[in-house]
Structure formats: structure tokens, C-alpha cells
């Protein structure tokens, strides 16, 4: 069995470690009829949510469904346009973070919100410092902080600088701050996004411990395996509206997916048979002199060719050579029959070769620019006449991308940094689709996006294949490789070690090649 969240999700192999107890009769938290409007755009409409003491309540939905907006209202970062919040059955208006703290609510964002140059204790007491006549009582703050850290089982000291801690340890600091403030409701937004598997296990143990101590935990995640591991109840949002809730006893992956995206799980890939055209890419014995030892493959027009393998097999290195990020030390690359060797990505783009990088934030997006500028970044030269950029053409391209990929955004002028992971990936895909590629290399095209966004990306890939685009898809998700690929190459330790097609494309054969069990 491959240890992949999505594999577990498809096959339904989940662990159920605790027995769900009957919740108290009255919710600790109720959100009734919550709406949030940004101009004419409704991010939330008439949303209801109830949370009980001593439960882990998962909040799910596609990227852009309104999960983070709802939680920001709860934390006082946004003010609701309509609706009310009740704590212990009594109305409790929240219009600022200070109100949320008074209500006993703490939101731990996906991006850590700590001051790195301060100590752990100073961060825990930030805004509620202990003072004496002579200034801050750092000794008492450190002692009190250490008590909370010990309760959490932390392996670091309250006197350490936050900058010296790992992401997982910084999360513990945020949880410690919530405990010191006697928070009763803890909201965690995609807390495992930057954690290793071992750190994730420790976090799960801590979350369960807090639940057992009576804390109410709202857990936002798109990872199905985490939901089955932790959740007592699950509520789903779709398009800014409340769809429904499921208890642990009737939790079912197919039902959850249908609630999130409005269609059955079986429609996720919806792969169509596309006529295959002429050879677009041929790679012969390619090497970069380091991780990539000897890779050979072929991709034809209209094909989606999967490239699978374990981490470190050399797949991304191959992508970088094909796009001109690095130069090959050995081997040959042919594009539409002609031998090529790109010296830069700019040269690759000029030949209509696109690369969707593995890490969209560090290698692909300009986070401080808006959607329009990100989408048109690769076509500025093409759309310029006498050094004047055709703004209307760029706007039309961007608006078509927003509508075609169903991005839930107010406008093309929104900064990319504020978008969900799924919408960020759609922006990047739209940029490269705009160059009208003949070869599109996609490195982990659906990493970090929810099920709904995956479906939209798959649909886009199929439409591009119909237009004759040759797609080389690198993916670590075996269901994705199996569900989307016409043929599959498998890499191991820098070598292409197997090619599969037709009925031979299955998870077992792929892993046999990847692990060296088959040659």
C-alpha cells in the first residue's frame, strides 16, 4: 500500500482511533446566518455552524468555498455583513480580534503569526505582559510559559528565540498562547501543510489531547486522511454556502466529495480518449551530471504522459533540463523532430514549451502582483506593439481564464498572495496556457489543492490534449497518474526504468518499478 493521503481517500483505508461521545445538548459556539460581502461579491451567504465542547469539528470545502473567510469572522479579522455569533447560547458580537480573545477564541493561521526575534515566552504573553515597577517581569513570564509548554510536551524552552524553532514547534507556541489565554475554541487552518509525517503525528496526538480536555477545535483541511483520523463531525461549505454536516459514524468519502463539489467522486478524472498525433518530444539518454543519470521518453501530440517515481528519482531535474533552467551534460532532446538545447526558459517559451513548477510560490507566482499581471507575464512580448503592451488583450485572456477555470475571485485585480492554493495554481496554469504551448510540462499540477480544484485542473488538461498539446505530467499521487495518463514512465534513482500503457497502468506495477521490485 502506498502511503499517500489521496490513495487512502480513494480506497477508503482510514483509521478510526477513538469512539465519538455524544456531544452536550447546547453548543459552545453557534454561527447563525453569517454572510460576508466584498463589494458586490458574496464570499459567504447564510452560513450556519455549531461547535460543541470536547469535539474536533472539521470544516471542509473547495478552495474558495469560504472556510477561511468564515473563520476570520470568528477571529475578528473580518466583520460579518449579516448574521450573529452565540457563545454558550448568548449573543456575543465579534468585531475585532480583541472581542474574539474575550470570547475564548484563537485562530492559528496556515502562515505562522509570531515575532521571530522575541522569545517563546514574550510571544505567549504578547499583548498581556506581566509588569512590575521596573518593567517587564520576564522571569515570571518565562516560568508561566514553561508550565504551559510542559503541559503540551514541548521539547524546547520558553527562553528560546522563536527564530530558532521549527515550524511544528512554532505551532506549539501558538497553541500554548491559546491555552494561557484560556481559549475554549481553537481554530486550525491547514496546520500540517508544512509539517513532516512525524511532526504531523505529534500534532494529531496534541489535538486529540486538547479535545479530551474539553476544548472545541475547528480543523480546516482538504486532506481526507486527516479528517478520518481526527474529526468527530464534519461540516461542508460550497460556493460560500453551508451544505451540511456529517458525524463520524456516517462519514463517507464519496458523500463528502459530492457535498464539496456537487458531483460524484467517479467524475473526478473523467478522462477521455484523445486521438494521438505526431511526436512532439523525444528525450534520449539525458543526464545533468548529478541526480539525473539516464532518462529517455517520448510524448506525442494529444497525449498525457505520466512521469512517476519516488522522491529524489530525478523527475523535477528532467523537467528543468527540458525547460532550459539547467543544461544537460549528456543526451539529446528533440522537439517536433529537431534537436534542441535551450539555454534559458525564455528560449523554451519562444518554442512554445511551458513548465508548471513543483513549488508555485517560490518558482512560479509573483505573489505581490495581481491576477492580471501574473497571467500575462509570459505573453508580454507577444502582446506588445512598438513596445506598447495591448492591455485589452491581456484583460480578455485573464477574464477568460477566470471564467473557464471557475476561479471564485472578485476581480482580476486581486493580489495573488491572498488567493487560495487552488486559485493560485489556476492562475499559473492560465499563464502557461496563454503561450499556446505545444509541450506542457506539469510538475505536481494538483499539489496542495482540494478535490474541486483538482477536477477543474484535470478538465483543463483534457481540453488542452484535445487541442493537440503534448502533456508531460509529473505526479507523486498514484491515483492521478493512473486516472489521467495515456502512458506512464517510471523513474528510479535518476533512470527511467519502466514504461506502462493501457491495462498495465496500475498502482502496483508503478510502485514495483519505482521501488526496484521489477525491471
Swiss-Prot record:
Q: How does it sit in the membrane?
A: Peripheral membrane protein
Example GO molecular function: ABC-type D-ribose transporter activity
As for subcellular location, the record says: Cell inner membrane
Domain called ABC transporter: residue spans: 29-264, 275-518
Q: Which reaction does it catalyse?
A: D-ribose(out) + ATP + H2O = D-ribose(in) + ADP + phosphate + H(+)
Question: Which enzyme type, at the first EC level?
Answer: translocase
Q: What is its EC number?
A: 7.5.2.7
Q: Where does ATP bind?
A: 61-68
Tell me the leader sequence span: none
- PROSITE patterns named in the record: ABC_TRANSPORTER_1, ABC_TRANSPORTER_2, RBSA
Family the UniProt entry places it in? Belongs to the ABC transporter superfamily. Ribose importer (TC 3.A.1.2.1) family.
What does the function comment of this entry state?
Part of the ABC transporter complex RbsABC involved in ribose import. Responsible for energy coupling to the transport system.
Q: How does it assemble?
A: The complex is composed of an ATP-binding protein (RbsA), two transmembrane proteins (RbsC) and a solute-binding protein (RbsB).
User: Protein name, please?
Assistant: Ribose import ATP-binding protein RbsA 2
| Name of the gene | rbsA2
